[in-house]
């Protein structure tokens, strides 16, 4: 078996991982169960049961890559990894289209975010050996970029016309099925708020739901990594709820990963609202996987990747416009019609059986059993310089305050 180096950009030690952190925790578990020796690098050297752990640093990249057969990286940490690590067959996880998500921060942070995202993505596409994505839309998006960088080239195409040796689908997964508890509350969960969501619309939706179901509530959760995840929309939602004096809107801490099932089981239904954009076309809402795992029917704005799942498994309702009343009517219908509610929970259970992590990560498991360098990248790919992000004024101030 292989010695696998997982390079996770998010802290894991606090036990409250978000999407990227959750994915790395589950990747570690699956590869460990396959018999691999797994070492996880993260900003805080957070532990994953059965795996060794260390901090992200230039020194750890150099030292641990020498002793590894394969590496898995995601996001901006790839810049430092490719700059300081010994060459090792590397899987780049592209399930999170961060360059598109972060366009929402233009007004707040200007061009710097896009420039750094672009540099990161182009460098990773050129230097990675194998790539993972979460949907067919993502696969085509990244293949287009790979043509531009030379990674999709005639030599590779002649050998592998379907490009499966270059990029494969490995969507999010869920943990083992769990029994569903009887549910009689009217509490609605939104979860964490990112700046591409529309939490104010969700508040208005539940305000309308309360005209028919007076005890309905809405809960948002605070992100566990606010220092690296802008919280503009969360602040907007808090201000809006205070202005309206809505006591049915709650803002609670992010649930610990090991305890999230018990937390989700308090709710009857999940709600997601967001505007339609390229981000929704490419995204795979990872929380939807967790909500289905816990049997929550879902009412959501339209995002093609997850729309298809909810429709296929009859596990939720997709609203294709921005109308508050349409979202509210769907929620009232599900909560009042027990047959509909139960059918959606049954569909969610079928989804869980078919989306276990060991199944969704099959392409990664195959690569780790036989790691390899992709030699055509040396012949066709452009080679942009690797540049680590210079510290911003805010970074320097934070370090000075900690000193």
Where are these regions (language model features)?
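N-terminal subdomain of nucleotide-sugar transferases
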Residues: 1-45, 201, 208-211, 391-403
């Amino acid at each position: 078996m292989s010695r696998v180096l997982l390079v996770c950009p998010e802290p894991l030690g606090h036990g409250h991982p978000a999407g990227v952190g959750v994915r790395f925790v589950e990747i570690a578990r699956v590869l460990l169960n396959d018999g691999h020796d797994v070492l996880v690098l993260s900003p805080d050297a957070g532990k994953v049961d059965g795996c060794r752990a260390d901090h992200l640093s230039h020194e750890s990249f150099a030292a641990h890559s020498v002793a590894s057969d394969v590496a898995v990286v995601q996001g901006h940490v790839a810049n430092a990894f490719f700059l300081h690590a010994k060459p090792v067959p590397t899987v780049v996880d592209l399930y999170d289209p961060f360059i598109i998500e972060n366009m929402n921060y233009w007004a707040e942070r200007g061009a710097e975010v896009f420039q750094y995202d672009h540099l990161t993505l182009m460098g990773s596409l050129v230097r990675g050996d194998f790539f993972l994505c979460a949907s067919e839309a993502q696969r085509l998006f990244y293949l287009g970029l790979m043509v531009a960088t030379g990674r999709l080239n005639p030599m590779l195409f002649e050998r592998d016309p379907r490009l499966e040796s270059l990029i494969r689908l490995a969507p999010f997964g869920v943990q083992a099925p769990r029994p569903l508890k009887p549910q009689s509350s009217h509490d609605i969960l939104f979860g964490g708020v990112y700046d591409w969501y529309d939490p104010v619309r969700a508040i208005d939706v539940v305000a309308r739901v309360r005209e028919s179901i007076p005890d309905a509530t809405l809960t948002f959760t605070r992100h566990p990594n606010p220092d690296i995840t802008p919280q503009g929309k969360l602040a907007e939602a808090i201000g809006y709820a205070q202005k309206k004096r809505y006591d049915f809107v709650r803002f609670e801490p992010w649930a610990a990963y090991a305890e999230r099932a018990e937390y989700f089981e308090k709710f009857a239904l999940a709600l997601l609202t967001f505007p339609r954009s390229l981000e929704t076309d490419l995204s795979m809402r990872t929380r939807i996987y967790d909500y289905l795992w816990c049997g929550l029917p879902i009412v959501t704005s339209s995002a093609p990747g997850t729309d298809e799942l909810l429709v296929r498994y009859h596990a939720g309702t997709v609203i294709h416009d921005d109308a508050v009343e349409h979202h509210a009517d769907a929620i009232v219908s599900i909560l009042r019609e027990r047959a509909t509610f139960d059918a959606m929970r049954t569909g969610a259970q079928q989804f869980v059986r078919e989306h276990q992590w060991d199944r969704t990560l099959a392409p990664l498991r195959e690569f780790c059993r036989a790691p390899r360098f992709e030699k055509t990248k040396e012949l066709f790919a452009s080679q942009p310089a690797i540049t680590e992000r210079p510290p911003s004024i805010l970074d320097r101030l934070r370090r000075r305050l900690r000193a």
